[in-house]
Amino acid sequence: MKSIDPRHYDVIVSPVVTEKATMASEHNKVVFKVLSGATKPQIKEAVEKLFDVKVKSVNTLVRKGKSKSFRGTFGTQSDVKRAVVTLEEGHRIDVTTGL
């Protein structure tokens, strides 16, 4: 059995299951919520080790937190960093089924 660095589990927080992310999966792309301080090389290494696939590229974005009102007080949700991971041809991660 291959050894997986426990830090890889900290980099990838969860898969993002939205309509847009599901449509991107048809083009060999998977969207993950990642640690806010994670770099593209760290994300690439974590995905390759955890899911045993080859990564072609990694694009990241930060979704700014929304302003919300709760019982008359205003607050802001936390910012979320997302990574759009493009996989090499022939490799696949299916996060939309089996949930």
From Swiss-Prot:
The keyword rRNA-binding applies. Keywords: Ribonucleoprotein, Ribosomal protein, RNA-binding, rRNA-binding. Pfam families: Ribosomal_L23. One of its GO terms (molecular function) is structural constituent of ribosome. GO terms for cellular component: ribonucleoprotein complex; ribosome. GO terms for biological process: translation. Part of the 50S ribosomal subunit. Contacts protein L29, and trigger factor when it is bound to the ribosome. Belongs to the universal ribosomal protein uL23 family. One of the early assembly proteins it binds 23S rRNA. One of the proteins that surrounds the polypeptide exit tunnel on the outside of the ribosome. Forms the main docking site for trigger factor binding to the ribosome. This is Large ribosomal subunit protein uL23.
